[in-house]
């Protein structure tokens, strides 16, 4: 049976430490039902797909929570991040080639041709994604340490 990961505890600690007023929801928005998480800057809501992550180990649950919390900080506290991250937040590249650009507070979209591997690499290379992944990894490493690195016997 999977352990019960306390999303709310880590969420509340993160928000308190950074004076962020955010919401946490486990009801994924439309079109994000298969995602592990997302952040919506308009509603200041971190969405975590707890049902999808239920069977995953706690360190994976923590990773996705901290990843989305980092996105919240990127959007709401841009002064703490460099111009490269701030600029990259205007663009979203989906795994399927759907791309978005933030223009006057609204996203415009287009669909590019290509395979999923290509778009996955583009997605993972976006500066705000690299930063969120690095931050989440460091947080998980602090929480779980060597549990992540058991060498095969």
PLM segments and residue spans:
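Zn2+-dependent metallopeptidase catalytic core
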Residues: 2-19
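Active-site recognition of the HExxH zinc-binding catalytic motif
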Residues: 63-75
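Post-HEXXH active-site segment of zinc metalloproteases
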Residues: 77-118
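Short arginine-rich
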Residues: 138-147
